């Protein structure tokens, strides 16, 4: 065993950081985690990410490293690549991107020139910053054109998207979102892209685990390139991947990630990705994905029963997006009240929201994390009612408010204790 300069446990050498980690463990165990972009990884994933690979610098790709001593780094990265390709049925993959944003930027660097036109879903309609939003590099370096959802239904209007693409003739068309709960017609997106000779990028960061399990439409038959994070419904470490069935595109992406965007890969994270991909290949992962959707649909049912407005009127995924305007409540007020009582979600803009980004008119919920913890329909029905109790209580008298809050705190404690991680 390597002898370290300071061969001590974290608790012995840095009590401040140890206390932060202990506190975060307690927070995750004692609160309901309903943020759509979060999940609970397995102990095996944590072990891999905290492994000795933390020490290894492995600049380059398997078999083509700029450093010696990369034998096992090569093996584990190849395992990750092989498992990922098997999981999604694709031919080529890069498992080195540190984040979803860097994965998307890697695609832009590989396929675009500064000033090229990119068409993606607008941020206020559920798109992601990296899909051409003004504050992002994607909105600064490229001519970003944004499509929107239908004002009445909240759904993607493919005919309007086609008109926009035909008008602006982009080099890249992006399909994907960060707050769109419904299925995406990747086939139609490819047909539209082909009409102007555009590349189609499918950003499946939110849906990857559901796609891997066959519970959400797959883009791989249609998209030129696919990006995803690894830490949402895929239930892996924080990181990202890029996949394609086109060898010429794969070669360009290899160069754009290294040496273009990144230097040394995070081998401990890649090891954890390999573990997570292996877990997702097991039969019980399909059961997990099915339960995710069942649980989110129960939330929709309860929210509707209690008078909340659901954007798109339902969900086909882990995401539930709620419009709070009929309740006269902002997302900011609701999310702070929920957090105080142990229910963690995020404030979120709804389509065509007029509130500021730090206020918003909506809430976004996700069912993936608590489904990992073992909660099913009956527990999610209880969660849905607790959420509605808190929202309805925001304008109640102080006496009523205190009573409701104590009841919710008690129920959250009982529920989290019964399913403690």
UniProtKB/Swiss-Prot annotation:
Keyword Amino-acid biosynthesis: yes
Keywords, in A-Z order: Amino-acid biosynthesis, Cytoplasm, One-carbon metabolism, Pyridoxal phosphate, Transferase
Enzyme class: transferase
Annotated positions binding (6S)-5,6,7,8-tetrahydrofolate: 123, 127-129
A GO term from the CC aspect: cytosol
Assigned EC number: 2.1.2.1
One GO molecular-function entry: pyridoxal phosphate binding
Cellular compartments annotated: Cytoplasm
Predominant location category: cytoplasm
A Gene Ontology BP annotation from the UniProt entry: glycine biosynthetic process from serine
Reactions catalysed, as given in the entry: (6R)-5,10-methylene-5,6,7,8-tetrahydrofolate + glycine + H2O = (6S)-5,6,7,8-tetrahydrofolate + L-serine
Biochemical pathway: One-carbon metabolism; tetrahydrofolate interconversion; Amino-acid biosynthesis; glycine biosynthesis; glycine from L-serine: step 1/1
Record-marked site positions (Plays an important role in substrate specificity): 231
Record-listed N6-(pyridoxal phosphate)lysine modification sites: 232
InterPro entries per the UniProt record, alphabetical: PyrdxlP-dep_Trfase, PyrdxlP-dep_Trfase_major, PyrdxlP-dep_Trfase_small, Ser_HO-MeTrfase, Ser_HO-MeTrfase-like, Ser_HO-MeTrfase_PLP_BS, SHMT-like_dom
Pfam families, per the entry: SHMT (PF00464)
Keyword Secreted included in the entry's annotation: no
Entry cofactors: pyridoxal 5'-phosphate
Function of the protein: Catalyzes the reversible interconversion of serine and glycine with tetrahydrofolate (THF) serving as the one-carbon carrier. This reaction serves as the major source of one-carbon groups required for the biosynthesis of purines, thymidylate, methionine, and other important biomolecules. Also exhibits THF-independent aldolase activity toward beta-hydroxyamino acids, producing glycine and aldehydes, via a retro-aldol mechanism.
Oligomeric form and interacting partners: Homodimer.
Family: Belongs to the SHMT family.
Protein name per UniProt: Serine hydroxymethyltransferase
Organism listed in the record: Ehrlichia canis (strain Jake)
Lineage, top ranks: Bacteria, Pseudomonadati, Pseudomonadota, Alphaproteobacteria, Rickettsiales
């Amino acid at each position: 065993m390597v002898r370290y300069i300071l061969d001590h446990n974290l608790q012995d050498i840095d009590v401040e950081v140890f206390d932060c980690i202990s506190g975060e463990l307690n927070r995750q165990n004692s609160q309901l985690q309903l943020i759509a972009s979060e999940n609970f990884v397995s102990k095996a994933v944590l072990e891999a990410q905290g492994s000795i690979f933390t020490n290894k610098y492995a600049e380059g790709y398997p078999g083509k490293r700029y450093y010696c001593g990369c034998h096992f780094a090569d093996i584990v990265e190849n395992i990750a690549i092989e498992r990922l390709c098997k999981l999604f049925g694709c031919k080529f993959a890069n498992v080195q991107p540190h984040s979803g944003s860097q994965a998307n930027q890697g695609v832009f660097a590989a396929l675009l020139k500064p000033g090229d036109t990119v068409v993606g879903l607008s941020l206020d309609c559920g798109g992601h910053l990296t899909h051409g939003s003004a504050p992002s590099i994607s909105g600064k370096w490229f001519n970003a054109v944004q499509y929107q959802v239908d004002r009445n239904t909240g759904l993607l209007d493919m005919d309007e998207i086609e008109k926009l693409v035909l008008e602006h003739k982009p080099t890249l068309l992006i399909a994907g979102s960060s707050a769109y709960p419904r299925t995406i017609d990747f086939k139609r997106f490819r047909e539209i892209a082909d009409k102007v000779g555009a590349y189609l990028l499918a950003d499946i960061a939110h849906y990857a685990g559901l796609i891997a399990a066959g519970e959400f439409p797959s883009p791989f038959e249609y998209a030129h390139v696919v990006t995803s994070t690894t830490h949402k419904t895929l239930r892996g470490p924080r990181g990202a991947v890029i996949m394609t069935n086109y060898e010429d595109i794969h070669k360009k992406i290899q160069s754009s990630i290294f040496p273009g965007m990144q230097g040394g890969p995070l081998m401990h994270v890649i090891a954890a990705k390999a573990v997570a991909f292996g877990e997702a290949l097991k039969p019980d992962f399909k059961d997990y994905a099915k339960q995710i959707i069942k649980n989110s649909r129960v939330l929709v049912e309860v929210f509707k029963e209690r008078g909340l407005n659901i954007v798109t009127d339902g969900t086909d995924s882990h995401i539930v997006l709620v419009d709070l305007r009929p309740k006269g409540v902002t997302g900011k007020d609701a999310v702070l009240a929920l957090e105080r009582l142990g229910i963690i979600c995020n404030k979120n803009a709804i389509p065509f929201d007029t509130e500021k980004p730090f206020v918003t008119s909506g809430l976004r919920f996700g069912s993936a994390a608590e489904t990992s913890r073992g909660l099913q329909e009956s527990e999610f029905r209880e969660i849905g009612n607790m959420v509605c109790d808190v929202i309805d209580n925001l304008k109640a008298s102080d006496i009523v408010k205190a009573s409701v809050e104590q009841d919710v705190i008690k129920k959250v404690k009982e529920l989290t204790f019964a399913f403690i991680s």
